[in-house]
C-alpha cells in the first residue's frame, strides 16, 4: 500500500496478542497490518467458501477480500488467527478488487469491539490502517461512483471458519476436502466442538447450534440487527462475523432491518433472527451429512437450538426486567404486552430498558406517573390516551410481579444495568466518527472506542453518546439514522448465482 497510516487500534486485543502500545504505534506495525510486509512466521492464505444468500444457494463466494496472515500463539497459550480485510484480491475474489474503504473499516472496527464489551460473542478487531490509496465505490448504488479513502481492518478470532466453508465442498461433492475441514476442528482448538469422526461431527453441529443460539440471544438482548445472515456470514464458533449493514434498534420494531436490499422481504429483520439462525444451522447439518450419513443424529443435534435459545432467552428476559427468574405462567403475557406497547409507542429500546431500572416498582402508586413520563420521553410517537392507559396497566402488572419476589430495589437495579447497556454504537455516532476520520481527525474514533469499552457504566460527562438523534424538540419523526446503505461491506444477492444445490439432503423440513 502506498503510504499506510494508523487510524486506531484496540489495546485489549493487542495485549491479548502480546503486543504493547509501543508495538502498535511503530512503523513496522503499520506496514504489517497494511499488508506491505510479513512478520516472522506469517503464511498468508485465503479460504474458499460458498453459501445461501437470502435463502438461495449462491455457489462460491469468498474469501473475496479477506487474507489470513496466520495463527498467533498468545502469551496465555491460546491461538488467534489474524485476518486482513481489504488488502486486495485473492484467488476467490471473482470480479471484485478485494479492497475496502475507510467508512466500512471504521464501522467494522468499532462494532467488533463494542459487541465484545457488550458481552456478545464476536470476532475482534486489532486495528484500522489507512492505505494512502483511493478506492472507487458507488456508495448509494445509483450509478455515481466516487473515490474514497482505502483502509484495512485486522480481524482477530480463534477461527474464521464459516458454515459456507463446509457447504462449498459438499456442493462440489469433494468429500476429501470436507473431511479435512472437519478434521481441523479438534478439541484443543475448539474446546471439544468436534473431530473428524461421524459421531464427533454430529457433536460439532450440536456445539455450533448451542453457541449460535447463545449468540442470537445476545443480539436480541441488546437490539442488534446483523442485516445479512447469509450462511457464509455465520461462524462455526457462534461468533458475530462480517459487520456490513448492521444496526441497533432505535424505536422497538421487530420488522426493522438496516439492509436496504432486504427492505421488501425483510428476511433478516430483527424479530426473524432466531428463525434464520436455525435455518442456517439446518444448512450446516445438510453440508456435514455426507460425512455422517445418519440423519437421526443430526436431527437430534438440531433440537439443541430451540432448547438452548428458550432457556437463555427466558433468563435474559427476566434479567432485563429485574426479575430473579422467568415464570412462564406470569411473565409470558407480561413480556408480550410490553413489547406490543413499545412497538406501538415507537419507544427507543436501549433507553427504555436502561431507565426502567431507575424506577422503583416497590414504591407507592405515584411511580406509575413517572413510568408514563419515562415512556413518553423515550418514544418517537406521541402517547395517545389509549397508549397511556395501556402503559399504566402494564406498569401496575409489572409492579405486582416485582413485589411477588420481595426483592431488594438496589439489587434489582444492578441486575438490570448489567444486561441493559447505556451505550451502543448507534449508526449516527459511527457516521460522525467516519466523517471526521475522512478529514484526517481520528479523535472521535478513539473517544467512541473508549466509551464503548464500558457500555454498562454511567460514564458521567459522556451522556451525549447515549442519546438518540431522533429524540428532542427539533429531531422530527422523519429523521432516520439508518446509514447502512453507506456501507459497502455486505454481499448483495445476485440472481445470476442462484442455482439449486444438487444432491442436497433435507435433514429437517423448515417453513
State each model region's role.
Residues 82, 123, 227, 296, ...:
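Short, solvent-exposed positions on alpha-helices
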Residues 229-234:
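Hydrophobic residue at the +6 position relative to the catalytic HRD Asp in the kinase catalytic loop
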Residues 286-294, 358-362, 377, 400, ...:
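Short, well-ordered loop/turn and helix-capping segments at boundaries between secondary-structure elements
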Residues 3-6, 11-29, 33-197, 236-241, ...:
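Conserved ATP-binding subdomain of kinase catalytic cores across diverse folds
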Residues 295-420, 427:
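Helix-loop elements that line ligand-binding/catalytic pockets
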Residues 104-105, 135-226, 237-342:
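ATP-dependent phospho-/nucleotidyl transfer catalytic cores
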Residues 42-50, 260-262, 405-409:
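Active-site Gly/Thr loop motif
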Residues 1-4, 371:
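General N-terminal leader/first-domain-start detector
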Amino acid at each position: 500500500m502506498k503510504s499506510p497510516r494508523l487510524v486506531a487500534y484496540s489495546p485489549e486485543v493487542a495485549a491479548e496478542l502480546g503486543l504493547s502500545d509501543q508495538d502498535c504505534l511503530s512503523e513496522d506495525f503499520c506496514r504489517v497490518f497494511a499488508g506491505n510486509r510479513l512478520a516472522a512466521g506469517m503464511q498468508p492464505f485465503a479460504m474458499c467458501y460458498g453459501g445461501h444468500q437470502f435463502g438461495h444457494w449462491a455457489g462460491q463466494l469468498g474469501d473475496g477480500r479477506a487474507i489470513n496472515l496466520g495463527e498467533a500463539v498468545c502469551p496465555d497459550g491460546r491461538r488467534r488467527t489474524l485476518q486482513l480485510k481489504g488488502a486486495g484480491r485473492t484467488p476467490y475474489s471473482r470480479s471484485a478488487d478485494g479492497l475496502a474503504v475507510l467508512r466500512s473499516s471504521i464501522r467494522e472496527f468499532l462494532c467488533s469491539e463494542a459487541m465484545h464489551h457488550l458481552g456478545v460473542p464476536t470476532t475482534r478487531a486489532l486495528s484500522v490502517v489507512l492505505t494512502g490509496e483511493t478506492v472507487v465505490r458507488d456508495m448509494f448504488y445509483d450509478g455515481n461512483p466516487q473515490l474514497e479513502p482505502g483502509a484495512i481492518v485486522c480481524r482477530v478470532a480463534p477461527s474464521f471458519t464459516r458454515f459456507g466453508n463446509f457447504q462449498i465442498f459438499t456442493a462440489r461433492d469433494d468429500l476429501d476436502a470436507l473431511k479435512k475441514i472437519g478434521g481441523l476442528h479438534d478439541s484443543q482448538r475448539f474446546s471439544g466442538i468436534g473431530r473428524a469422526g461421524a459421531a464427533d461431527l454430529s457433536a460439532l453441529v450440536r456445539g455450533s447450534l448451542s453457541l449460535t443460539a447463545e449468540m442470537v440471544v445476545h443480539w436480541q438482548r441488546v437490539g442488534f440487527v446483523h442485516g445479512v445472515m447469509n450462511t457464509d456470514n455465520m461462524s462455526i464458533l457462534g461468533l458475530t462475523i462480517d459487520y456490513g449493514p448492521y444496526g441497533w434498534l432505535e424505536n422497538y420494531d421487530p420488522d426493522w432491518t438496516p439492509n436496504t436490499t432486504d427492505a421488501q422481504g425483510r428476511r433478516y429483520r430483527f424479530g426473524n433472527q432466531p428463525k434464520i439462525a436455525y435455518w442456517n444451522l439446518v444448512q450446516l447439518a445438510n453440508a456435514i451429512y455426507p460425512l455422517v450419513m445418519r440423519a437421526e443424529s443430526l436431527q437430534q443435534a438440531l433440537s439443541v437450538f430451540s432448547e438452548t435459545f428458550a432457556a437463555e432467552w427466558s433468563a435474559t428476559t427476566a434479567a432485563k426486567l429485574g426479575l430473579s427468574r422467568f415464570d412462564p405462567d406470569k411473565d409470558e403475557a407480561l413480556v408480550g404486552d410490553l413489547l406490543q406497547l413499545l412497538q406501538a409507542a415507537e419507544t427507543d429500546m436501549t433507553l427504555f430498558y436502561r431507565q426502567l431500572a431507575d424506577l422503583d416498582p416497590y414504591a407507592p402508586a405515584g411511580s406509575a406517573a413517572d413510568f408514563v413520563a419515562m415512556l413518553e420521553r423515550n418514544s418517537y410517537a406521541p402517547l395517545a390516551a389509549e397508549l397511556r392507559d395501556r402503559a399504566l396497566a402494564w406498569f401496575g402488572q409489572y409492579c405486582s410481579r416485582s413485589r411477588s419476589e420481595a426483592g431488594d430495589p438496589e439489587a434489582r437495579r444492578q441486575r438490570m444495568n448489567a444486561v441493559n447497556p447505556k451505550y451502543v454504537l448507534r449508526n449516527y455516532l459511527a457516521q460522525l466518527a467516519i466523517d471526521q476520520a475522512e478529514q484526517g481527525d481520528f479523535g472521535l474514533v478513539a473517544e467512541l472506542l473508549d466509551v464503548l469499552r464500558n457500555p454498562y457504566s454511567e460514564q458521567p460527562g459522556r451522556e451525549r453518546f447515549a442519546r438518540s438523534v431522533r429524540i428532542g424538540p427539533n429531531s422530527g419523526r422523519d429523521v432516520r439514522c439508518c446509514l447502512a446503505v453507506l456501507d459497502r461491506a455486505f454481499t448483495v444477492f445476485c440472481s445470476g448465482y442462484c442455482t439449486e444445490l444438487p444432491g442436497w439432503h433435507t435433514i429437517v423440513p423448515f417453513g
